[in-house]
């Protein structure tokens, strides 16, 4: 599936709609911010999607994706850094996940260099799961 679209396999519990952060019906819950910065010596565009601050609790609950922060290389629009925050809590599922992905160029190839994950989820009738890991990717053999 792709974050920001409704191209997901299942739509149980309205999750399909909740992942479509650019859908016209979901836009009322989010701020969309474009800026730029220098990140690791690369000029980057910064695109942030985050839940609006002035929402009521019931409105915030409509937004499974609480934040997506992306740094795009200005030269080719490759993602150099991406951060996700997911929060959802209802009678069927409770989840809270943070994912951060670092990407860079190795031998001219765009590759992930580090992935951080810190998450919790509990689905009705299943054991709750908690994971926290830091995956460092290195020694790429680019041919």
Regions of interest found by a model, annotated:
Residues 1-64, 88-90, 120-143:
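Structured extracytoplasmic
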Residues 37, 72-73, 104:
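Hydrophobic alpha-helical segments, especially N-terminal targeting/anchoring helices
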Residues 40-48, 78-83, 109-114:
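Short, hydrophobic/aromatic-rich segments at coil-to-beta transitions
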Residues 49, 81, 96-98, 112-118, ...:
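Extended beta-sheet lipid-handling architectures
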Residues 57-59, 94, 99:
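Flexible domain-boundary/linker segments
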Residues 65-68, 72-86:
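Long, charged/polar, surface-exposed segments that mediate recognition or autoinhibition
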Residues 67, 98-107:
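Extended lipid/amphipathic-ligand handling interfaces
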Residues 89-94, 106-109, 114:
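Membrane-proximal, glycine/serine-rich, low-complexity loop/turn segments characteristic
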């Amino acid at each position: 599936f792709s974050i920001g679209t409704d191209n997901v396999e299942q739509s149980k519990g309205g999750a399909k709609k909740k992942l479509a952060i650019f859908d016209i019906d979901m836009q009322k819950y989010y701020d969309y911010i474009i800026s730029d910065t220098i990140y690791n010596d690369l000029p980057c565009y910064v695109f942030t999607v985050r839940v609006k601050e002035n929402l009521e609790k019931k409105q915030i609950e409509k937004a499974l994706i609480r934040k997506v922060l992306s740094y795009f290389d200005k030269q080719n629009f490759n993602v150099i850094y991406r951060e996700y925050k997911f929060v959802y809590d209802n009678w069927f599922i409770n989840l809270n996940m943070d994912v951060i992905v670092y990407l860079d160029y190795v031998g001219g190839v765009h590759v992930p260099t580090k992935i951080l994950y810190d998450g919790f989820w509990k689905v009705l009738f299943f054991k709750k799961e908690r994971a926290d890991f830091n995956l460092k990717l290195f020694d790429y053999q680019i041919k």
